[in-house]
Amino acid sequence: MIHRYLDPDESLGELLFGLIMALTVTLGVRLLGSQDTLKPHELAIALIGCNVAWGIIDGVLYLLGSLFSRGQRNHFIRKLRKVSSQGEAISAIREEFGLDDDHLAQEKDLAAFYMATLDVLRHARIERARVRGKDLMAALMIVVLVSATAVPGAVPILLVGDPAVALRVANALQLCLLFAVGYHWARYVGANPWRTGLIIVGLCVVLVAISIALGG
């Protein structure tokens, strides 16, 4: 269901975002806080509240991004229709889509693609940029994904009696989930799953360390 509204890179990116935030909280408390005075319920509420808040923020930013993209597309179509020559129009499309640098096709195929794109855009109907139902569902999915990543960290904090052990379990679970996201990511890009999982874990740990060091 998620991938009906979000691309795999978007959904996996949101999971990483949420896990990094949750790990920043639990690892930061373990490294910098006093575990003797730790109040599990307060920490769990703070952890979940942080992820829910940032999930909402990220969802709203997604909606703004969708509006911006549609507005930008409409502006490009209007600009394209004002161009006096076909050569200028093709140049504008080349600049907008930027496929030349990817070396995905031969020049003659790219030229045919740009001509077809020009024909489509010249006859495209311009609609007012607005938020659609699919955008709202995608934003909701983002809120759910980012919020859900707080659960693996919050559950041990609430259920394990020893705060030090609870934090170790929470951190271990979150690191395992980071690896799982990287492992799953590799399936979409044809990379080595184990290597990708380990790279994602290492990269995210570095980001968490930077966040903690800077007071985040």
Describe the function of each predicted region.
Residues 1-52, 56-57:
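Cytosolic-side membrane-entry/anchor segment at the start of a transmembrane helix
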Residues 10-19, 126-175:
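Transmembrane alpha-helical segments and their cytosolic interface motifs
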Residues 33-36, 62, 66-74, 158, ...:
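Transmembrane helix-loop junctions in multipass membrane proteins, especially transporters and channels
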Residues 47-55, 143-147, 201, 205:
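Transmembrane helix-bundle signature of multi-pass membrane transporters/permeases
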Residues 48-78, 82:
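Hydrophobic alpha-helical membrane-embedded segments
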Residues 71-142:
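Cytosol/matrix-facing amphipathic helices and coiled-coil assembly/linker segments
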Residues 180-205:
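Interfacial loop-to-transmembrane junctions
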Residues 208-216:
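Juxtamembrane boundary at the C-terminal end of a transmembrane helix
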